[in-house]
Amino acid sequence: MGARASVLTGGKLDQWEKIYLRPGGKKKYMMKHLVWASRELERFACNPGLMDTAEGCAQLLRQLEPALKTGSEGLRSLFNTLAVLYCVHNNIKVQNTQEALEKLREKMKAEQKEPEPEQAAGAAAAPESSISRNYPLVQNAQGQMVHQPLSPRTLNAWVKVVEEKAFNPEVIPMFMALSEGATPQDLNTMLNTVGGHQAAMQMLKEVINEEAAEWDRGHPVHMGPIPPGQVREPRGSDIAGTTSTLAEQVAWMTANPPVPVGDIYRRWIVLGLNKIVRMYSPASILDIKQGPKETFRDYVDRFYKTLRAEQATQEVKNWMTETLLVQNANPDCKNILRALGPGASLEEMMTACQGVGGPAHKARVLAEAMTQAQTATSVFMQRGNFKGIRKTIKCFNCGKEGHLARNCKAPRKKGCWKCGQEGHQMKDCRSGERQFFREGLASLQREARKFPPDNNKERANSPSNRELWVSGGEDHTGDREGRKGEDRELSVPTLNFPQITLWQRPILTVKIGGEIKEALLDTGADDTVIEEIQLEGKWKPKMIGGIGGFIKVKQYDNVIIEIQGKKAVGTVLVGPTPVNIIGRNFLTQIGCTLNFPISPIETIPVKLKPGMDGPRVKQWPLTEEKIKALTEICTEMEKEGKISRIGPENPYNTPIFAIKKKDSTKWRKLVDFRELNKRTQDFWEVQLGIPHPAGLKKKKSVTVLDVGDAYFSCPLDENFRKYTAFTIPSVNNETPGIRYQYNVLPQGWKGSPAIFQSTMTKILEPFRKNNPELVIYQYMDDLYVGSDLEITQHREAVERLRSHLLTWGFTTPDKKHQKEPPFLWMGYELHPDKWTVQTIQLPEKDTWTVNDIQQLVGKLNWASQIYPGIKVKQLCKLIRGAKALTEVVTLTREAELELAENREILKEPVHGAYYNPDKELIAEIQKQGQGQWTYQIYQDLHKNLKTGKYAKMRSTHTNDIRQLTEVVQKVALESIVIWGKTPKFRLPVQKEVWETWWTEYWQATWIPDWEFVNTPPLVKLWYQLETEPISGAETYYVDGAANRETKLGKAGFVTDRGRQKVTSISETTNQQAELQAVLMALQDAGQEVNIVTDSQYVLGIIHSQPDKSESELVNQIIEELIKKERIYLSWVPAHKGIGGNEQIDKLVSTGIRKVLFLDGIDKAQEEHERYHSNWKAMASDFNLPPIVAKEIVASCDKCQLKGEAIHGQINCSPGVWQLDCTHLEGKIILVAVHVASGYLEAEVIPAETGQETAYFILKLAGRWPVKVIHTDNGSNFTSATVKAACWWANIQQEFGIPYNPQSQGAVESMNKELKKIIGQIRDQAEHLKTAVQMAVFIHNFKRKGGIGGYTAGERIIDIIATDIQTTKLQTQILKVQNFRVYYRDSREPTWKGPAKLLWKGEGAVVIQDNGDIKVVPRRKAKIIRDYGKQMAGDGCVASGQDESQDME
């Protein structure tokens, strides 16, 4: 492809590079345009080699021209490029692309006027112009139309389009362009090449079948034979190419008159592609809205792209364009578009909205005003760009020459851009001269405002209130004295200063050399530049870098400028500037500064949880000294703007109290935000853990900073502040309490950490980009700054960081600014080449409480990350169970020994190394015994990066290899978090042992790289189970049973050799009895044994090959297993009549299991234990008397708490469902109830969003006929996504009454029922989502009651089946009523009627005649359709009508 760059050489290449892309533009054609064109030609299935000659270019242009109307912008650009190349080959001189296209059109017209003789002859031979001249049908030398197969390039281009565009709207015009003139066979070839998209092709196939059937209905086949020489008429399947040959297709397309089967088939395919595009691009045109920061051009692009995918008529699309395009624009653009008036063209809209980007436009202005650069940023232009005469351009917005409206710096104007009036467009303007709507601002209306006395507080409250201050000036309001001596926060000037808010451009009226002008105060500009002003004195010529390049200006020195009553003398430049600018050379003289409140950061919006209100917790009494301390603290906080006083209109309250700080006489204010935290929305933690020093790279220079008053520097959402209200009471209720609310993030509120972290990240992001040489670790208010710079450069960079943070209101106190090692950071101690944890002192105590042990274990866990060998298992055993914090515990001998060992380990300081990315990570694991493990991660031997321990027993019964795999997983995860990769493992286990375990028992696919290290004690499997029965060994059938009430049980075995043994046990359970039976069998058996059990519990324990357990009984079984040479364990289902199992079952059940004279009781009890079915379901399924079934429910400890659920039914339509979200265990459960039947669908969803809810609704609609859904007014249910899903599935959505649970009665009661069932079976499932599905199953199929005594599952099926039958019957009735009956009475021979047919049977019909219902034999009745009023009698229709032809 690169060879295409040599299309032009020598002089022609020079000529090519002199041609402009656009008239009046700056860019010219370059070599890269030729390379691009050759690649595009390959995409459009054309030969790039044709570009080398003029004739080739002409062929390509003829090929591409028919597709221009439907083609994309890329196709037009390619055509334009080839047109210019054609002119260069033919030495036609052109200046730009437009001229090349005009020359090409002239040449084509000339060729049409003077056709060549051969062309004329060809035209005479084939006069019909409708025949396709494009491929694949071409005319041979004899004048016949022959088929030319599609080229591989065309097919390749089509495949690329589908793969790259993935069925977005652009696929349709590309298909039209590539399939021009194709036959149905060619079109099928194109479709077959993208057969991988089976779903799309199936949809396309369905559309084609429907269109083919419609064609057949509209074009019936003519009867009789086809005349000789005439082609048969195509059927729908012929057009689709399935039942027609290529020759027939060509004949139809070239006949006279032609039948364009190719074009018809293309239309069908386009209909199908429209449907596919709609599916693959599900965004509705209603959802396309302009973002607040989105440019109008991008919004229009998205709008029309989505509009192309909409399946609607052109009239509807026109209406969408006229209404929705303006309606869904952002407020800034909407104002401009409405000012243009109705009927404005898209071009006028695009022109008017150039450069407008909502808040982005404001942000650009703000950024411009905040720029503090010391030197001007000049934009230099290439000198070559001044060659030649260029057409001058004029701005629509300000009327000045030299720039376009989108680059205009002047304020954007509303209304007509010619006269300034609103209500008409510029094209309709009748005014002759321009008037600019900003002229009214020339007077001094923009008077400086004064702050109210408490404005300091207000500025802290509103982070959006950024101000430009002019210091020390006279106030135009007349109050020249001002307020002196008042306290100022963050060096804010005295309150009589004028202010100019920066939410609009700071344009003021100024006096320059006696003339009044409007000018922009620009703190980012060095110089002051004014346009069209006559100043006295001499001037010097000067060139400055301005907007759009260099501009020539006149420099006047010692000019007097008056701004807001302040005078200054300096240099003024006069020249063609788009907007008058007052630069820093004058602003610094008058003391103009940029000032910020506490935080210029945008607040993050916060809401309460749906349906909840703020906290209303009463303030508890406080002592006098605490009230005094809180009053002082709050007074200081109010001065600083962190809190504000509020009145009685705020109904919310949170209690506060005070505690003394550690080792201090000062008090600390605490707010009990527990109730507010429950009611506040959930937040996503921005940072999932704390950074670890082992992951730090070694740096030459390091600094540690701390952000002071971190939370109090971040503003709280204004709408949320009222919920943080608190009250300081008075002693003996002497006066009403003083009420405050927070303006900043409060300590103890659940949202503060996440919002602060997010805010700090946004603030540091630009600094990180501008200073890539610095590594900044940020966790809450701790900052680690490292670099490889020299110490002086590093400290300069740190000072820049501190200044950057201060700009945003974050201070970094000197007392916590650590410049020299060791650095104390995040509980660690950092040295230049090593790290350790901060010094740990273990307390010496005679008596230990639970709280003491908890703190001790916390310290040891912290130390274990660098001190290898730390153990805490025995200490943790001391505080198992629910114990009070102050309860005294006695150290066991093992715990004392463990603590003594840990003290010894901590005596010698241990240090960790820093991470080197160039070296390999190695993790070594050792077994310490008693289920405890230790590990080290290092790169160089004896220089650990990090150490750790592991002592978890994830299951009651485990073995060393399972624990080792858990340690490996923990270390791998830890390594990924800290270093982003997994280490190579060195494990104390032999390859054979490890591989045996992994292949036989471990269900996992990921195995890390590891090698064997011979570090005793080695891990091994102590016994192994056989996978097949052992021939010749005795087989033991084991079983156990226990009575729940008496706790008495039996365990025993029966062998295949006739031996048996049964033992009675006290204080046992079924599971313990089953284990006891296995132990008895193992103790009785020889070295080889087969054991058969019916207990999945026993099978699960022994199959996991444990070598240790917390159960003494299981430990005894393990000892017996180790003694055996070979063991085979098998499971059989209970109560299925299996010989040995049934025999032992009867033996151990005697006198243990209850017998209530009915065989089904055991099964019912077993089912109830599993599903907690209600008594009606058990009585029905197991044929139990109601009293017995109720006794089973009553004896269940989980079902007797709240009694039996009351079932009732609401008489509703079969298609009505109620949906609601409920919460359990911190998770969200979306519940749907079929109101008529009580049938339940529920699912745990990851988030309460519209997307998840819509997906659930679509799944529900795919399973059941859903006509109406009834929901509350939650944000997820009212979202556009849910509305779109309901629209697509044709579901009507209804909403309940806000905060009224009765309007959602069915689903609300079902929420309680579902939670109750989950509570009964929760211990059977590990995850909540499993428990939810189990509870749904139980409710739908294991609980009977309500209408019909059905389960909910049976009831919904019955209701739907009945509804279908009723509908069908109703249809039949309506069909029957379309007939009329003429009948004869037995006594009279004349025909009577017509009567209304009510029912038609085999031997008689039921009719209604004049209100009387009669039964008439079929032989005396004639049934006919109701064709209107007929006369009965001789020769009437009734006498000759055959009913069998009219009615089935």
UniProtKB/Swiss-Prot annotation:
Residues linked to a lipid group, N-myristoyl glycine type: 2
Regulation of activity: The viral protease is inhibited by many synthetic protease inhibitors (PIs), such as amprenavir, atazanavir, indinavir, loprinavir, nelfinavir, ritonavir and saquinavir. RT can be inhibited either by nucleoside RT inhibitors (NRTIs) or by non nucleoside RT inhibitors (NNRTIs). NRTIs act as chain terminators, whereas NNRTIs inhibit DNA polymerization by binding a small hydrophobic pocket near the RT active site and inducing an allosteric change in this region.
A GO cellular component entry from the record: viral nucleocapsid
UniProt-listed SMART domains: ZnF_C2HC
Mapped zinc finger ranges (CCHC-type): 393-410, 414-431
Free-text description of this protein's post-translational modifications in UniProt: Specific enzymatic cleavages by the viral protease yield mature proteins. The protease is released by autocatalytic cleavage. The polyprotein is cleaved during and after budding, this process is termed maturation. Proteolytic cleavage of p66 RT removes the RNase H domain to yield the p51 RT subunit. Capsid protein p24 is phosphorylated.
InterPro entries, alphabetized: Aspartic_peptidase_AS, DNA/RNA_pol_sf, Gag_p24_C, Integrase-like_N, Integrase_C_dom_sf_retrovir, Integrase_C_retrovir, Integrase_cat-core, Integrase_Zn-bd_dom_N
Molecular function via GO: aspartic-type endopeptidase activity; DNA binding; DNA-directed DNA polymerase activity; exoribonuclease H activity; RNA stem-loop binding; RNA-directed DNA polymerase activity; RNA-DNA hybrid ribonuclease activity; structural molecule activity
Zinc finger extent (Integrase-type): 1159-1200
Residues that hold Mg(2+) 2 according to the record: 1039, 1074, 1094, 1145
Pfam families for the chain: Gag_p17, Gag_p24, Gag_p24_C, IN_DBD_C, Integrase_Zn, RNase_H, rve, RVP
Note: The reverse transcriptase is an error-prone enzyme that lacks a proof-reading function. High mutations rate is a direct consequence of this characteristic. RT also displays frequent template switching leading to high recombination rate. Recombination mostly occurs between homologous regions of the two copackaged RNA genomes. If these two RNA molecules derive from different viral strains, reverse transcription will give rise to highly recombinated proviral DNAs.
Protein name: Gag-Pol polyprotein
Originating species: Simian immunodeficiency virus (isolate EK505)
